[in-house]
């Protein structure tokens, strides 16, 4: 009795090796006596069921060919922070079992049966990128044809790793891969093929996909690489799945409000520079824009730096620069109306040059100084820009930086005119920078 258990182990091992290494396998005869109009006696396939632990072959040197296809029925979510794609698909496997064969004419016309998949040998096909445990439900069935062809459909919820690039968010396209491979069988034992053409897989997936949410399917391509691990070579089929984000939600909730606020900020330059409402108005816009960014933060990706974040930072910077320009002009007007300093000669000459008719420099707006009740036509001293340009100034009038011929009122008028010219110049520079920046972002989004 002491040597009984090792002897049984040796016998079992010899039986297994003989089944695997034999040059020809035994062919099982399907007895049609078990077929009738009410079904099939399971005992008819019992010999096949008993060998479900072994790959079915009649010649060990010939690998089993497994044809693969799948249908992508839902894109459940994309996690940019974890770089994961969650999808639902049906995986279809087709292979031949040489031990299953019957004549439908002799078997009451039955040419196809459904059998519990757990009673058959199943290829160990898995998705390489999958980051989750296989949760295939139990009790699935497989179709068996009279020629021994087996078709096995398997529903799968796949959480797969995907290299996500969110730089072009929300106009981004992602390319994820599903790589089907065998975990155990090398190319000597199993080869993978296509059950359907790629265009058929794409068309079927587009028709049956049930999610009309954030992502849409663009197309599917394939490649057939080989994976080498040590001395073993495994066959693979790699599918490239291209998906695109639907940007409507983000355009309506992010881009349109942001563009409106920036446009209103630009239009606020048309408020009179002497008005006390321009600076508070711009401050209110700036605070409102910050509140808008805080409220919409949940719609932005949690990782990376998408181009839309650069766009928001650019808009915020433009509003800050606009406010600083208003502060600068307000300061110039304050100095001009309280204690105007002597104007340097070069600045006075530049002002005369720029305000002369036909010049390309920005002309100072002919706005009244509402705070003083003065206008350029009512202030004594210097003439209008046109008159100043056409008149040869006397020796005393050509020295605004120290000559005694210039009164405080005349200096005030010059500094107010200079402030208006600077306001116009800075406004044009602001518009130029804003237009070029926004066009650059749009071009980057379209590349």
UniProtKB/Swiss-Prot annotation:
Alphabetic keyword roster: Cell membrane, Disulfide bond, Ion channel, Ion transport, Ligand-gated ion channel, Membrane, Postsynaptic cell membrane, Receptor, Signal, Synapse, Transmembrane, Transmembrane helix, Transport
Regarding the membrane, this protein is recorded as: Multi-pass membrane protein
| Stretches for region HA-stretch | 401-423
Which SUPFAM superfamilies does the protein's record reference? Answer: Neurotransmitter-gated ion-channel transmembrane pore, Nicotinic receptor ligand binding domain-like
Q: Where is this region: Disordered?
A: 380-405
The segments annotated as topological domain Cytoplasmic are 270-282, 330-424
Q: Does the keyword Metal-binding apply?
A: no
Query: Which GO biological process annotations does it have?
Result: chemical synaptic transmission; inorganic cation transmembrane transport; monoatomic ion transmembrane transport; regulation of membrane potential; serotonin receptor signaling pathway; serotonin-gated cation-selective signaling pathway
Q: Where in the cell is it found?
A: Postsynaptic cell membrane; Cell membrane
- Tissue specificity: Expressed in many tissues including adult brain, colon, intestine, lung, muscle and stomach as well as fetal colon and kidney.
Its main subcellular localisation, reduced to a broad class, is: membrane
**Cellular component, GO annotation:** neuron projection; plasma membrane; postsynaptic membrane; serotonin-activated cation-selective channel complex; synapse; transmembrane transporter complex
Q: Which PROSITE patterns match?
A: NEUROTR_ION_CHANNEL (PS00236)
Under InterPro entries, the record lists: LGIC_TM_5-HT3, Neur_chan_lig-bd, Neur_chan_lig-bd_sf, Neur_channel, Neuro-gated_channel_TM_sf, Neuro_actylchol_rec, Neurotrans-gated_channel_TM, Neurotransmitter_ion_chnl_CS
Chain ranges passing through the membrane: 249-269, 283-303, 307-329, 425-445
Pfam families to which the protein is assigned, alphabetical: Neur_chan_LBD, Neur_chan_memb
The cysteines joined by S-S bonds are 162-176
Composition bias (Basic and acidic residues) maps to 384-399
Q: Which residues form the signal peptide?
A: 1-27
Similarity annotation: Belongs to the ligand-gated ion channel (TC 1.A.9) family. 5-hydroxytryptamine receptor (TC 1.A.9.2) subfamily. HTR3C sub-subfamily.
The record's function comment reads: Forms serotonin (5-hydroxytryptamine/5-HT3)-activated cation-selective channel complexes, which when activated cause fast, depolarizing responses in neurons.
- Self-association or partners: how does it assemble? Forms homopentameric as well as heteropentameric serotonin-activated cation-selective channel complexes with HTR3A. The homomeric complex is not functional. Heteropentameric complexes display properties which resemble that of neuronal serotonin-activated channels in vivo.
What protein am I looking at?
5-hydroxytryptamine receptor 3C
Give the gene name: HTR3C
């Amino acid at each position: 009795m002491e040597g009984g258990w090792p002897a049984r182990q040796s016998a079992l091992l010899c039986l297994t090796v003989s089944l695997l290494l034999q040059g020809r396998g035994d062919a099982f005869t399907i007895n049609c006596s078990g077929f009738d109009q009410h079904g099939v006696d399971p005992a008819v396939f019992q010999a096949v069921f008993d060998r479900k632990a072994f790959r079915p072959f009649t010649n060990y040197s010939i690998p089993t060919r497994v044809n693969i296809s799948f249908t992508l029925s839902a894109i459940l979510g994309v996690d940019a922070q974890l770089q994961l794609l969650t999808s639902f698909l049906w995986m279809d496997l087709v292979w031949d079992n040489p031990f299953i064969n019957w004549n439908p004419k002799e078997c009451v016309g039955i040419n196809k049966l459904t059998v519990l998949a757990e009673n058959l040998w199943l290829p160990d096909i898995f998705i390489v990128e999958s980051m989750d445990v296989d949760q295939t439900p139990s009790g699935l069935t497989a179709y068996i044809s009279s020629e021994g062809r087996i078709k096995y459909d398997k529903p799968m919820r796949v959480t797969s790793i995907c290299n996500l690039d969110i730089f072009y968010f929300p106009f981004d396209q992602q390319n994820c891969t599903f790589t089907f491979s065998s975990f155990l069988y090398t190319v000597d034992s199993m080869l993978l093929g296509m059950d359907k053409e790629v265009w058929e897989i794409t068309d079927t997936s587009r028709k049956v996909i049930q999610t009309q949410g954030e992502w849409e399917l663009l197309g599917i391509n394939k490649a057939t690489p080989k994976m080498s691990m040590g001395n073993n070579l495994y066959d693979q089929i790699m599918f490239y799945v291209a998906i695109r984000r639907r940007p409507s939600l983000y355009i309506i909730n992010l881009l349109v409000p942001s563009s409106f606020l920036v446009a209103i900020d630009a239009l606020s330059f048309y408020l009179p520079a002497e008005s006390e409402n321009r600076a508070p108005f711009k401050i209110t816009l700036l605070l409102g824009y910050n509140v808008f960014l805080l409220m919409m933060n949940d719609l932005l990706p949690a990782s990376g730096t998408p181009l839309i974040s650069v766009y928001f930072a650019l808009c915020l910077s433009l509003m800050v620069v606009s406010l600083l320009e208003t502060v600068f002009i307000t300061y110039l007007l304050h100095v001009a109306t309280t204690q105007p300093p002597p104007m340097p000669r070069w600045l006075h000459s530049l002002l005369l040059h720029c305000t002369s008719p036909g010049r390309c420099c920005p002309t100072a707006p002919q706005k009244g100084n509402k705070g003083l009740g003065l206008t350029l036509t009512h202030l004594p001293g210097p003439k209008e820009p046109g008159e100043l340009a056409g008149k040869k100034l006397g020796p005393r009038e050509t020295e605004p930086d120290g000559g005694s011929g210039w009164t405080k009122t005349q200096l005030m008028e010059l500094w107010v005119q200079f402030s208006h010219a600077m306001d116009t110049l800075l406004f044009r520079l602001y518009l130029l920078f804003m237009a070029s920046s926004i066009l650059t972002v749009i071009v980057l989004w379209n590349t």
